[in-house]
Swiss-Prot record:
<dbReference type="Pfam" id="PF18913">
    <property type="entry name" value="FBPase_C"/>
</dbReference>
<dbReference type="GO" id="GO:0006094">
    <property type="term" value="P:gluconeogenesis"/>
</dbReference>
<dbReference type="GO" id="GO:0046872">
    <property type="term" value="F:metal ion binding"/>
</dbReference>
<dbReference type="GO" id="GO:0005829">
    <property type="term" value="C:cytosol"/>
</dbReference>
<feature type="binding site">
    <location>
        <position position="121"/>
    </location>
    <ligand>
        <name>Mg(2+) 2</name>
    </ligand>
</feature>
<feature type="binding site">
    <location>
        <position position="100"/>
    </location>
    <ligand>
        <name>Mg(2+) 1</name>
    </ligand>
</feature>
<dbReference type="GO" id="GO:0042132">
    <property type="term" value="F:fructose 1,6-bisphosphate 1-phosphatase activity"/>
</dbReference>
<keyword id="KW-0119">Carbohydrate metabolism</keyword>
<dbReference type="Pfam" id="PF00316">
    <property type="entry name" value="FBPase"/>
</dbReference>
<dbReference type="InterPro" id="IPR020548">
    <property type="entry name" value="Fructose_bisphosphatase_AS"/>
</dbReference>
<dbReference type="GO" id="GO:0005986">
    <property type="term" value="P:sucrose biosynthetic process"/>
</dbReference>
<dbReference type="GO" id="GO:0006002">
    <property type="term" value="P:fructose 6-phosphate metabolic process"/>
</dbReference>
<feature type="binding site">
    <location>
        <position position="277"/>
    </location>
    <ligand>
        <name>substrate</name>
    </ligand>
</feature>
<keyword id="KW-0460">Magnesium</keyword>
<feature type="binding site">
    <location>
        <position position="100"/>
    </location>
    <ligand>
        <name>Mg(2+) 2</name>
    </ligand>
</feature>
<feature type="binding site">
    <location>
        <position position="215"/>
    </location>
    <ligand>
        <name>substrate</name>
    </ligand>
</feature>
<protein>
    <recommendedName>
        <fullName>Fructose-1,6-bisphosphatase, cytosolic</fullName>
        <ecNumber>3.1.3.11</ecNumber>
    </recommendedName>
</protein>
Amino acid sequence: MDHAGDAMRTDLMTITRYVLNEQSKRPESRGDFTILLSHIVLGCKFVCSAVNKAGLAKLIGLAGETNIQGEEQKKLDVLSNEVFVKALTSSGRTCILVSEEDEEATFIEPSLRGKYCVVFDPLDGSSNIDCGVSIGTIFGIYMVKDFETATLEDVLQPGKNMVAAGYCMYGSSCTLVLSTGSGVNGFTLDPSLGEYILTHPDIKIPNKGKIYSVNEGNAKNWDGPTTKYVEKCKFPTDGSSPKSLRYIGSMVADVHRTLLYGGIFLYPGDKKSPNGKLRVLYEVFPMSFLMEQAGGQAFTGKQRALDLIPTKIHERSPVFLGSYDDVEDIKALYAAQEKTA
Protein backbone atom coordinates (compact mmCIF):
# COMPACT_ATOMS: atom_id res chain seq x y z
CA MET A 1 0.00 0.00 0.00
CA ASP A 2 1.41 3.37 -1.03
CA HIS A 3 1.31 5.93 1.75
CA ALA A 4 3.34 8.54 -0.13
CA GLY A 5 0.33 10.64 -0.96
CA ASP A 6 -1.36 10.27 2.39
CA ALA A 7 -2.21 13.76 3.64
CA MET A 8 -2.26 12.50 7.23
CA ARG A 9 1.39 11.39 7.39
CA THR A 10 2.20 11.88 11.05
CA ASP A 11 5.84 12.81 10.50
CA LEU A 12 4.86 15.88 8.47
CA MET A 13 1.52 16.93 9.90
CA THR A 14 1.80 20.11 11.95
CA ILE A 15 -1.16 21.30 14.00
CA THR A 16 -1.55 24.29 11.66
CA ARG A 17 -1.77 22.04 8.63
CA TYR A 18 -4.14 19.70 10.41
CA VAL A 19 -6.54 22.53 11.26
CA LEU A 20 -6.32 23.92 7.71
CA ASN A 21 -7.17 20.43 6.41
CA GLU A 22 -10.20 20.33 8.72
CA GLN A 23 -11.18 23.82 7.57
CA SER A 24 -11.10 22.74 3.91
CA LYS A 25 -13.73 20.08 4.69
CA ARG A 26 -16.15 22.82 5.76
CA PRO A 27 -17.09 25.05 2.82
CA GLU A 28 -18.80 27.57 5.11
CA SER A 29 -15.59 28.14 7.10
CA ARG A 30 -13.93 31.55 6.80
CA GLY A 31 -10.76 30.70 8.67
CA ASP A 32 -11.77 32.37 11.95
CA PHE A 33 -11.44 29.16 13.94
CA THR A 34 -8.00 28.48 12.44
CA ILE A 35 -6.82 31.95 13.50
CA LEU A 36 -8.24 31.49 17.01
CA LEU A 37 -6.56 28.13 17.40
CA SER A 38 -3.21 29.49 16.22
CA HIS A 39 -3.38 32.04 19.07
CA ILE A 40 -4.18 29.28 21.59
CA VAL A 41 -1.22 27.28 20.25
CA LEU A 42 1.03 30.34 20.63
CA GLY A 43 -0.13 30.74 24.24
CA CYS A 44 0.67 27.08 24.93
CA LYS A 45 4.18 27.47 23.48
CA PHE A 46 4.81 30.51 25.65
CA VAL A 47 3.58 28.82 28.82
CA CYS A 48 5.54 25.66 27.99
CA SER A 49 8.71 27.74 27.75
CA ALA A 50 7.91 29.55 31.02
CA VAL A 51 7.21 26.26 32.84
CA ASN A 52 10.51 24.82 31.63
CA LYS A 53 12.39 27.86 32.93
CA ALA A 54 10.35 28.33 36.10
CA GLY A 55 13.03 27.24 38.55
CA LEU A 56 15.70 29.36 36.89
CA ALA A 57 13.51 32.43 36.52
CA LYS A 58 12.32 32.32 40.15
CA LEU A 59 8.73 32.13 38.96
CA ILE A 60 7.87 29.31 41.32
CA GLY A 61 7.21 31.31 44.50
CA LEU A 62 3.79 32.61 45.50
CA ALA A 63 2.62 35.82 43.89
CA GLY A 64 1.00 36.85 47.15
CA GLU A 65 -2.53 37.15 45.80
CA THR A 66 -5.48 34.79 46.11
CA ASN A 67 -7.69 33.85 43.16
CA ILE A 68 -11.47 33.49 43.05
CA GLN A 69 -11.23 29.83 44.15
CA GLY A 70 -9.44 30.86 47.38
CA GLU A 71 -6.19 29.29 46.17
CA GLU A 72 -2.92 31.13 46.63
CA GLN A 73 -1.74 32.02 43.17
CA LYS A 74 1.62 30.92 41.91
CA LYS A 75 3.53 33.39 39.79
CA LEU A 76 3.22 31.01 36.86
CA ASP A 77 -0.58 31.01 37.23
CA VAL A 78 -0.63 34.78 36.95
CA LEU A 79 1.72 34.79 33.98
CA SER A 80 -0.14 32.01 32.15
CA ASN A 81 -3.47 33.76 32.64
CA GLU A 82 -2.13 37.04 31.26
CA VAL A 83 -0.60 35.24 28.27
CA PHE A 84 -3.84 33.51 27.29
CA VAL A 85 -6.05 36.56 27.86
CA LYS A 86 -3.76 38.64 25.63
CA ALA A 87 -3.40 35.91 22.99
CA LEU A 88 -7.15 35.30 22.80
CA THR A 89 -8.03 39.01 22.79
CA SER A 90 -5.50 39.86 20.07
CA SER A 91 -6.86 37.08 17.85
CA GLY A 92 -9.87 39.30 17.13
CA ARG A 93 -12.02 36.16 17.11
CA THR A 94 -13.36 36.07 20.69
CA CYS A 95 -16.14 37.95 22.47
CA ILE A 96 -16.15 36.41 25.98
CA LEU A 97 -13.36 34.75 27.98
CA VAL A 98 -13.84 32.77 31.18
CA SER A 99 -10.67 31.93 33.10
CA GLU A 100 -10.27 29.91 36.28
CA GLU A 101 -8.12 32.74 37.61
CA ASP A 102 -10.62 35.58 37.09
CA GLU A 103 -13.72 36.12 39.20
CA GLU A 104 -15.74 37.65 36.37
CA ALA A 105 -15.98 36.80 32.70
CA THR A 106 -13.98 39.09 30.38
CA PHE A 107 -16.04 40.79 27.67
CA ILE A 108 -13.84 41.79 24.74
CA GLU A 109 -14.16 45.38 23.54
CA PRO A 110 -16.45 45.66 20.48
CA SER A 111 -13.72 46.58 17.96
CA LEU A 112 -11.81 43.34 18.71
CA ARG A 113 -14.76 40.97 18.94
CA GLY A 114 -15.32 37.70 17.10
CA LYS A 115 -17.84 34.88 17.26
CA TYR A 116 -16.18 32.57 19.81
CA CYS A 117 -16.29 32.24 23.59
CA VAL A 118 -13.27 30.55 25.17
CA VAL A 119 -13.34 28.97 28.63
CA PHE A 120 -9.98 27.92 30.06
CA ASP A 121 -7.86 26.98 33.03
CA PRO A 122 -4.51 28.58 32.15
CA LEU A 123 -2.42 26.37 34.42
CA ASP A 124 -4.18 23.38 35.95
CA GLY A 125 -2.30 21.51 38.69
CA SER A 126 -0.02 24.45 39.43
CA SER A 127 0.45 23.35 43.06
CA ASN A 128 2.61 20.57 41.56
CA ILE A 129 5.09 22.91 39.86
CA ASP A 130 7.62 22.74 42.68
CA CYS A 131 8.00 18.96 42.45
CA GLY A 132 8.16 18.66 38.66
CA VAL A 133 4.84 16.88 38.12
CA SER A 134 3.13 17.43 34.75
CA ILE A 135 0.72 20.36 34.66
CA GLY A 136 -1.32 21.80 31.82
CA THR A 137 -3.72 24.22 30.17
CA ILE A 138 -7.35 23.16 29.53
CA PHE A 139 -9.66 24.96 27.11
CA GLY A 140 -13.09 24.76 25.49
CA ILE A 141 -14.58 26.83 22.67
CA TYR A 142 -18.20 27.85 22.07
CA MET A 143 -19.63 29.75 19.12
CA VAL A 144 -22.16 32.55 19.72
CA LYS A 145 -25.08 33.58 17.54
CA ASP A 146 -24.40 37.31 17.66
CA PHE A 147 -21.07 38.45 19.07
CA GLU A 148 -22.12 42.10 19.13
CA THR A 149 -24.81 41.38 21.73
CA ALA A 150 -23.10 38.44 23.48
CA THR A 151 -24.06 37.90 27.12
CA LEU A 152 -23.07 35.47 29.86
CA GLU A 153 -25.85 33.16 28.63
CA ASP A 154 -23.69 32.47 25.57
CA VAL A 155 -21.12 30.87 27.88
CA LEU A 156 -23.53 29.08 30.23
CA GLN A 157 -24.31 26.38 27.69
CA PRO A 158 -24.13 22.60 28.02
CA GLY A 159 -20.78 21.08 27.09
CA LYS A 160 -22.31 19.26 24.11
CA ASN A 161 -22.56 22.68 22.40
CA MET A 162 -18.78 23.17 22.38
CA VAL A 163 -17.24 23.32 18.92
CA ALA A 164 -13.79 22.30 20.17
CA ALA A 165 -11.89 21.39 23.32
CA GLY A 166 -8.39 20.42 24.27
CA TYR A 167 -5.53 20.55 26.72
CA CYS A 168 -1.81 21.12 26.57
CA MET A 169 0.31 19.10 29.00
CA TYR A 170 3.68 20.45 30.10
CA GLY A 171 5.69 17.42 31.18
CA SER A 172 8.56 15.35 29.83
CA SER A 173 7.33 16.66 26.49
CA CYS A 174 4.82 19.36 25.58
CA THR A 175 1.72 17.58 24.26
CA LEU A 176 -1.41 19.25 22.88
CA VAL A 177 -4.53 17.09 22.61
CA LEU A 178 -7.35 18.53 20.52
CA SER A 179 -10.82 17.70 19.25
CA THR A 180 -12.79 19.83 16.82
CA GLY A 181 -15.75 17.47 17.01
CA SER A 182 -14.48 14.76 14.67
CA GLY A 183 -12.21 12.59 16.80
CA VAL A 184 -9.21 13.33 19.02
CA ASN A 185 -5.63 13.97 17.92
CA GLY A 186 -2.45 14.51 19.91
CA PHE A 187 0.43 16.78 18.87
CA THR A 188 3.88 17.01 20.43
CA LEU A 189 5.98 20.17 20.38
CA ASP A 190 9.24 19.69 18.49
CA PRO A 191 11.50 22.23 20.25
CA SER A 192 13.93 22.40 17.32
CA LEU A 193 11.13 23.38 14.90
CA GLY A 194 8.91 25.25 17.34
CA GLU A 195 6.00 23.32 15.83
CA TYR A 196 3.45 20.88 17.19
CA ILE A 197 3.69 17.65 15.15
CA LEU A 198 0.92 15.04 14.96
CA THR A 199 2.20 12.12 17.05
CA HIS A 200 -1.06 10.54 18.27
CA PRO A 201 -3.52 10.46 15.34
CA ASP A 202 -7.15 9.52 15.98
CA ILE A 203 -6.85 8.62 19.67
CA LYS A 204 -9.35 5.95 20.76
CA ILE A 205 -9.68 5.06 24.43
CA PRO A 206 -9.87 1.29 25.12
CA ASN A 207 -13.41 0.09 25.96
CA LYS A 208 -12.20 -1.14 29.33
CA GLY A 209 -9.09 -0.30 31.31
CA LYS A 210 -6.97 -1.73 34.11
CA ILE A 211 -6.45 1.55 35.97
CA TYR A 212 -8.62 3.67 38.26
CA SER A 213 -7.61 7.16 39.31
CA VAL A 214 -9.05 8.83 42.42
CA ASN A 215 -7.91 10.60 45.58
CA GLU A 216 -8.55 7.85 48.13
CA GLY A 217 -7.71 10.26 50.94
CA ASN A 218 -11.34 11.42 50.69
CA ALA A 219 -12.78 7.89 50.94
CA LYS A 220 -14.42 8.33 54.35
CA ASN A 221 -16.62 11.10 52.91
CA TRP A 222 -17.68 9.34 49.69
CA ASP A 223 -21.23 8.33 48.80
CA GLY A 224 -22.31 4.69 48.46
CA PRO A 225 -21.83 4.14 44.69
CA THR A 226 -18.30 5.60 44.67
CA THR A 227 -17.31 3.52 47.71
CA LYS A 228 -18.73 0.36 46.11
CA TYR A 229 -17.04 1.04 42.78
CA VAL A 230 -13.57 1.56 44.28
CA GLU A 231 -14.07 -1.54 46.46
CA LYS A 232 -14.90 -3.47 43.28
CA CYS A 233 -11.74 -2.13 41.59
CA LYS A 234 -9.60 -3.37 44.47
CA PHE A 235 -11.43 -6.57 45.37
CA PRO A 236 -13.30 -7.83 42.27
CA THR A 237 -15.79 -10.63 42.94
CA ASP A 238 -16.09 -11.82 39.33
CA GLY A 239 -12.69 -13.49 39.15
CA SER A 240 -11.06 -10.63 37.24
CA SER A 241 -7.76 -9.03 38.28
CA PRO A 242 -7.86 -5.96 40.54
CA LYS A 243 -7.38 -2.59 38.84
CA SER A 244 -4.22 -0.61 39.55
CA LEU A 245 -4.51 2.76 41.30
CA ARG A 246 -2.73 5.65 39.59
CA TYR A 247 -3.35 9.16 40.91
CA ILE A 248 -1.07 12.11 40.18
CA GLY A 249 -3.29 14.91 41.47
CA SER A 250 -2.88 16.95 38.29
CA MET A 251 -6.07 16.58 36.24
CA VAL A 252 -4.38 17.01 32.87
CA ALA A 253 -1.82 14.28 33.63
CA ASP A 254 -4.41 11.87 35.10
CA VAL A 255 -6.85 12.37 32.20
CA HIS A 256 -4.06 12.10 29.60
CA ARG A 257 -3.01 8.71 30.97
CA THR A 258 -6.65 7.58 31.13
CA LEU A 259 -7.21 8.66 27.51
CA LEU A 260 -4.19 6.73 26.22
CA TYR A 261 -4.29 3.61 28.41
CA GLY A 262 -7.97 3.34 29.33
CA GLY A 263 -9.56 3.06 32.74
CA ILE A 264 -11.49 5.62 34.75
CA PHE A 265 -10.82 8.98 36.39
CA LEU A 266 -13.09 9.80 39.33
CA TYR A 267 -13.58 13.10 41.15
CA PRO A 268 -16.77 12.43 43.10
CA GLY A 269 -18.71 14.73 45.32
CA ASP A 270 -18.43 13.93 49.02
CA LYS A 271 -19.78 15.07 52.40
CA LYS A 272 -17.34 17.99 52.51
CA SER A 273 -17.78 19.02 48.86
CA PRO A 274 -21.13 17.69 47.55
CA ASN A 275 -20.41 19.14 44.09
CA GLY A 276 -16.83 17.93 43.98
CA LYS A 277 -13.92 20.26 43.31
CA LEU A 278 -13.69 20.38 39.51
CA ARG A 279 -15.15 23.34 37.66
CA VAL A 280 -17.78 22.57 35.02
CA LEU A 281 -16.94 25.01 32.23
CA TYR A 282 -13.18 24.71 31.93
CA GLU A 283 -12.35 21.34 33.52
CA VAL A 284 -15.31 18.94 33.39
CA PHE A 285 -16.68 19.98 29.97
CA PRO A 286 -13.47 20.00 27.89
CA MET A 287 -12.24 16.69 29.33
CA SER A 288 -15.69 15.10 28.92
CA PHE A 289 -15.84 16.35 25.31
CA LEU A 290 -12.47 14.74 24.57
CA MET A 291 -13.44 11.46 26.26
CA GLU A 292 -16.66 11.15 24.26
CA GLN A 293 -14.86 12.02 21.02
CA ALA A 294 -12.35 9.24 21.78
CA GLY A 295 -15.12 6.69 22.36
CA GLY A 296 -15.38 6.95 26.14
CA GLN A 297 -17.99 8.42 28.48
CA ALA A 298 -18.33 11.11 31.14
CA PHE A 299 -20.96 11.04 33.90
CA THR A 300 -21.72 13.36 36.83
CA GLY A 301 -23.39 10.81 39.09
CA LYS A 302 -26.77 12.03 37.82
CA GLN A 303 -26.48 12.58 34.08
CA ARG A 304 -24.22 12.67 31.03
CA ALA A 305 -21.64 15.34 31.89
CA LEU A 306 -22.02 17.21 28.58
CA ASP A 307 -25.79 17.62 29.14
CA LEU A 308 -25.25 19.64 32.32
CA ILE A 309 -26.36 23.27 32.03
CA PRO A 310 -24.23 25.49 34.29
CA THR A 311 -25.81 28.48 36.03
CA LYS A 312 -22.55 30.13 37.20
CA ILE A 313 -19.20 30.42 35.43
CA HIS A 314 -17.24 28.81 38.29
CA GLU A 315 -19.81 26.11 39.07
CA ARG A 316 -18.46 22.71 40.18
CA SER A 317 -19.59 19.16 39.49
CA PRO A 318 -18.55 15.61 40.34
CA VAL A 319 -17.28 13.69 37.32
CA PHE A 320 -16.51 10.09 36.35
CA LEU A 321 -14.85 9.83 32.96
CA GLY A 322 -12.91 7.28 30.95
CA SER A 323 -13.41 3.95 29.18
CA TYR A 324 -16.99 3.27 28.07
CA ASP A 325 -17.45 0.01 30.01
CA ASP A 326 -15.83 1.33 33.18
CA VAL A 327 -18.13 4.36 33.26
CA GLU A 328 -21.09 2.04 32.57
CA ASP A 329 -20.17 0.16 35.78
CA ILE A 330 -20.36 3.28 37.94
CA LYS A 331 -23.56 4.42 36.19
CA ALA A 332 -25.13 1.07 37.11
CA LEU A 333 -24.23 1.60 40.78
CA TYR A 334 -25.84 5.06 40.79
CA ALA A 335 -28.92 3.68 39.01
CA ALA A 336 -29.22 0.93 41.65
CA GLN A 337 -29.04 3.55 44.41
CA GLU A 338 -31.81 5.55 42.71
CA LYS A 339 -34.07 2.49 42.69
CA THR A 340 -33.63 1.85 46.41
CA ALA A 341 -33.95 5.53 47.36
